[in-house]
Amino acid sequence: MAILLGLVVGVLTLVAWWVLQNYTYWKRRGIPHDPPNIPLGNTGELWRTMPLAGILKRTYLKFRKQTDGPFAGFYLYAMKYIVITDVDFVKTVLIRDFDKFHDRGVYHNEKDDPLTNNLATIEGQKWKNLRQKLTHTFTSAKMKSMFSTVLNVGDEMIRVVDEKISSSSQTLEVTDIVSRFTSDVIGICAFGLKCNSLRDPKAEFVQMGYSALRERRHGWLVDLLIFGMPKLAVKLGFQFLLPSVQKFYMKIVQDTIDYRMKRKVTRNDFMDTLIDMKQQYDKGDKENGLAFNEVAAQAFVFFLAGFEAGSTTMGFTLYELACNQDVQDKLRAEIDSVLERYNGKLEYDSMQDLFYMEKVINESLRKHPVVAHLARIATKPYQHSNPKYFIEAGTGVLVSTLGIHHDPEFYPEPEKFIPERFDEEQVKKRPTCAFLPFGAGPRNCIGLRFGRMQVIIGLALLIHNFRFELHPKTPVPMKYTINNLLLGSEGGIHLNITKVVRD
């Protein structure tokens, strides 16, 4: 009995020592930080009253003038992180010294949760090789070849909206309709599939997209492990994605591969690149090829990124245009002028002339960055010029995109929607990393060109054809949902829509 009691006391002593060491790390280092709570660290409000984006924004804005170094300490559950408070050091981490911070340090489980093992999460040389292979899929030439396909989906969206406001109410929840637009765009551009999401309210592509991003497989305790201790979660075999989501996307990818291989279909698209890599793997070239599960994972993340990031950006932009009618009028005038110069047609070349549109989208992404924070991990020890701010290998790094975008030093009156902030002269006055909607450096968003193209096409068609005004159901200022991985609106964005009548 005495031996057992001694063992229990010994174990409890070790646990207490670990807790004390872990949660006093930043205090012992003398690094400014908010006092942590055990076991949630500085994230006690997470998914209950505030999204992680809000917590990190608050931390950034609080400590940006209160620290004698480039970062503050932070505890994401039990993991020690830094929150960068100096945009020049953001550039150091993302660009200058990328070789020391090249991994994101987030959960991915190749064995038990294969779709999470994708370009956004994988690490080291494996990531570098895959990134190089996929980059050519998103060249300007490829975008130009897909333009008419995206435009056709956009024209269908206009017909659907026109029918809805003619036959029933003039009020629509716009994030729903633009989500269906981006779902159909990604379906046809990535998989060669006509998803019919715009016409079918129960389209499986849309429902599975929502499930992958918003439905939780576990309660908060397992999520604590997955997000706070990802390596331990992998060792324990925990899975993040729902089984129904895994099954759906695996089947879609397998069916697409089978169809193209049997019929010798070539579309020169993202899926063709992945199929080529799978064939290399099947021939024994493991270094340059991809196994089926890896192919499915890349297709999955491409769909989710295009579906959610594109639709959310469009939704937030329509919201801001409804709040700022003068901006909406100015944008519509530009669209009409460009269309008139190109015989009433939106073309790839005419899209390049929508300069004010670019500023409007950038200002929307500034106020509401869909990816509201960036994550990295120190893969090597890093010595800052101030010795106190040494970073140990394995320390997590967080960049609050939302915080930087709302920093009054870079954006005076940050809550106001002012597209002119992105006039060329104004942009030159700001640091490089004061605007990070797509990240920066070698690990920025690979699908940036595609994402911008689908957003510009969708918004140009909508603003040309319809006027958007606020509905009382939509809050001002915007309220963000507390349980999304990406930034999203709480309760949707309900707007009044009327058709633009021209003489």
Swiss-Prot record:
Record's InterPro entries? Cyt_P450, Cyt_P450_CS, Cyt_P450_E_grp-I, Cyt_P450_sf, Insect_CytP450_Detox
One GO MF annotation is:
oxidoreductase activity, acting on paired donors, with incorporation or reduction of molecular oxygen
**Top class in the EC scheme:** oxidoreductase
Cross-referenced SUPFAM superfamilies, in alphabetical order?
Answer: Cytochrome P450
Specify the protein's topology with respect to the membrane.
Peripheral membrane protein
State the family it belongs to: Belongs to the cytochrome P450 family.
Protein name as it appears in the record: Probable cytochrome P450 6a19
Query: Which organism is this entry from?
Result: Drosophila melanogaster
- Provide the organism lineage as a comma list: Eukaryota, Metazoa, Ecdysozoa, Arthropoda, Hexapoda
